[in-house]
Amino acid sequence: KSNGMVSEGHAYFSQQLNFETPIRTENGTEISMIKMTVKSRVLLXGTVALIYPSPESIDFQGLFVKLFLSKPSPPVLSLNETTDAGQFSLNDTNEDPFAPLSRSRRAVSNSXNANASLVSEILERIGPVCLFFDRQFQLYSLNVNSVNLTLSASVSVQIDGPHTSRIDVSLVLSVGQNLTSVVIQKFVRMVSLQELSDVNLNFPPIFRFLRGSTSFLESNTDVRGRLVVLARFRLSLPLQNNSVDPPRLNLKIEPYAVIVVRRLIVAMSVBXIQQXVXARXVVXXSGPKVTLSFNDDQLCVTVSDRVIGPDVPVTFFRRLRVCRRIPRVGRLWVRTRRGWRLRRIFTFSRRCFWVIISGFRGRLSPTVTQEGFVRVCNITKAANPSILLPTPTSQIAQSISTAQMVSSTSASIFATPVLALQSSSLRISPASTAPTSATVSSPVASIS
């Protein structure tokens, strides 16, 4: 048990029993002792699956062994869990002694391949495969008095064999050029992931004050406000969609964040006249949702998102800085010929304050960018002779530039290719030791 939760548990012990009277078998052999060995496998289910699991030692107490001798078939030993913690019973059944135990806790359902729980084992079974994906995109943008409030996301997937596999997901909120706040920044090492149904991580709320100022020529811009962020992170690795034989992989990562900027005030001052805008922006971002899957001899990564950004109520007003001299009356003891006398002293102080000269209320419409369904796949050595991979046409020029193939009219992809090109249709012949050719055809560019 680990915190009262057990995903699977099997005992291991070795015991030798010596008989006082030897047992004679049918072929005339005498048996004076019997040695029993039961192997075990224990999978601990925890609440955090983003760290390396630490090995745990298990002590068995109250373990009773019962030996059954029957003529029709040799004895078959199996382990069944009892209701009492730490006690096991050994019964005569026809079940496999190392079959996984069924559990109903945490909605975990075991399959025939439940013992192969690491994603690295699935990647080893897939074979030599590489997949690299790196993308940054802007989800939300709002211009408040020439200051941009933007929400950006980045996804990075690096898979180079079973032991070098990592997924990075981050959400960053920027106010202007100097104020940056990280909303979510998580990385998942797939070599440490166990087969779990769902893992939900609720981050503590983030409360932060935003203060900054910039100056350009004779104008000064001040930004101040309060940032509130509620974020959570979900990792889904269901048992029924992952197996080692046949190799199947389905991993989903879904970050979610609600960002509230309370009373964001952007004030621009020029020659004692200030134009200020007070806004209350609310952004609900679901994504970027990352899905890593292996089906039909293809290892693919899919990225999508959904952002909700309603209109922002704002208040525009102009105010004038007015300074006045305010007299003050004080008393001071002064020494004269007749002695100490109390005199009145008049002093003047300078006070400045803002006077609103105009103002009105309205709404600002933000720019919400919905990232489309982006899918990038790689082909292993066991791939079909010809596989068609559709991708968005609008990203052809950017992807070809990323692959550094624009300056040349011919390109080749070697064995175990890393798919860096995206086009309306991309056809790759099977990988081999010799260079493989790739042909890209689209309305934007054409190389062969």
From Swiss-Prot:
Superkingdom of the organism of origin: Eukaryota
Alphabetized UniProt keyword annotations: Secreted
Species the sequence originates in: Acropora millepora (Staghorn coral)
Localisation: Secreted
Keyword Secreted recorded: yes
Secreted recorded as keyword: yes
Protein name from the UniProt record: Uncharacterized skeletal organic matrix protein 1
Tissue: Component of the acid-insoluble and acid-soluble organic matrix of the aragonitic skeleton (at protein level).
CC per GO annotation: extracellular region
Chief place of localization: secreted
